[in-house]
C-alpha cells in the first residue's frame, strides 16, 4: 500500500522565499499534473469521503479534486464559487482575509441541497476561513456537511481549530 503523504511529498515542489522572504511555499501543482499523483490523491480523498451523496469542490483546485472524487464515488459535484461568478439568486458567505474579505457562493436555485449529505473538498487547509465559509453557506442551504477533506494542511496556521466540530481529514500535514 502506498502512503499518500509520501506520494504528495515526492511530487510537491517547495519554493523558498515565496510569496515573501522566509516563507517556504509548497506548490501542489506538480502533484495534480502527475497522472499517478492525481489518481492516488483522488482515491485517498474518495475513501475519506464515502457516504456523502454530493461533493462540494471549493474554487479553484477543489474543482479539480472534487470532480475526480465525484466520478470515483458515482455522485455529483457542486462548484463552490468565488463571489460574483454565478448568476443570481445565490447563497453566499463572506469571510475575512489578511487584508479584507472574500465571498463564496452556490446557486440558490436548480440544485436541491436540503437534507443532502455533502463533503467539502479543497486543496489546502490554512487558517480555515475558506472551509468555514463553505460549511456556513452549505448549512444555510440546508445541507448536512459530513466533513471536509484536504490534500494538505498547514498545521501551524490553526485552521483545524477554526472548523471544530467539523471532521477534517488531511492527506498530508506540513
From Swiss-Prot:
PROSITE patterns associated with the record: PUR_PYR_PR_TRANSFER (PS00103)
Catalytic activity: AMP + diphosphate = 5-phospho-alpha-D-ribose 1-diphosphate + adenine
GO molecular function, a single term: adenine phosphoribosyltransferase activity
E.C. number: 2.4.2.7
Cellular component terms (Gene Ontology): cytoplasm
Enzyme superclass (EC): transferase
GO biological-process terms attached to the record: adenine salvage; AMP salvage; purine ribonucleoside salvage
Pfam families the record matches: Pribosyltran
Location of the protein in the cell: Cytoplasm
Quaternary structure note: Homodimer.
Function of the protein: Catalyzes a salvage reaction resulting in the formation of AMP, that is energically less costly than de novo synthesis.
PANTHER family named in the record: ADENINE PHOSPHORIBOSYLTRANSFERASE (PTHR32315:SF3)
Family note: Belongs to the purine/pyrimidine phosphoribosyltransferase family.
Protein name: Adenine phosphoribosyltransferase
Source organism of the structure: Mycolicibacterium vanbaalenii (strain DSM 7251 / JCM 13017 / BCRC 16820 / KCTC 9966 / NRRL B-24157 / PYR-1) (Mycobacterium vanbaalenii)
Gene: apt
